[in-house]
């Protein structure tokens, strides 16, 4: 530890102690908050089922930065490189299309054995795993419908895929000793004016009920469902709307997934957390950065990311909220994208933990909104960066932009060889 860091750390401890904050306790609490990194940033959501196939489902990865992962070994190596540069606890979020098999496997036939390497890798790296059925980029999703499909056989295919995915998820949870959160998102919807909005939702309701009909050990597996406002090609009608899934998660007591990019641009999920928590047992968050639409830009340390973190910490939702990331930028170094976004999420959590929330609550309850605003703004100038640097030091990761040197070296030695 450098003398400069020691001095900054001691000063930060004193400054935060003056407003009633124990920085050591804040760092202990930060170690209770894993962030689930998404594997699909590493290869632009290509997966290994059909890497040359087109990405469908109303989502899009833009850019053509060289060096994307082409197989599971490369993807795991890239993830390891990124994780070395991110302090504190982490998880990995997998999609079903990231299976490994020497022969083609139909999505309704995926089994834990197809993800054995991921499980062993996660155990070796002390990671939890989360999972997702992949209801997109497939011939049977080409017409824009999956779990709400009017064709019984096609709908059953996707039901069986989600059932098989639950078994994989439970396998991860059992093997790793931490529950896997399995999130169901479907692209189902219509491009133009829709006459019958009810029937697809009735089919989706029945399909989801069949998917989750078998009770699984909650210590191994957690079901989550995710809404969306619209997607490319489904601008006019989305079957799985916010109202649909809020009602579903409430009535079935599943987890509800809130994605930062899946709402109208004037809406923010930070404002939805406390409302949803009154009705559902758990939340899954997909922290992202929409720019005019759900374009999944790399997460910044911006107002909304901070507000999301503050909601989790202020209401002590550590055991009820699962923090995941969801962005895929193919225009920049993909490892850097992981590092930037994940570090920013963790910085936001740390800043929330360094807030004098009890004092702010007193001011709010007393109606002293002047002091509330003044203190909220003044705390932004407190030396939280020194606390972050100490956290990085203790986790043997670079504190500042030094991590970029490691990424550039990896790019030169490894990524540049991929063509």
UniProtKB/Swiss-Prot annotation:
Its main location: cytoplasm. One of its GO terms (biological process) is L-lyxose metabolic process. It catalyses: L-rhamnopyranose = L-rhamnulose. Pathway: Carbohydrate degradation; L-rhamnose degradation; glycerone phosphate from L-rhamnose: step 1/3. Mn(2+) binds at residues 262, 294, 296. It is found in: Cytoplasm. Homotetramer. Catalyzes the interconversion of L-rhamnose and L-rhamnulose. Belongs to the rhamnose isomerase family. This is L-rhamnose isomerase. The gene is rhaA.
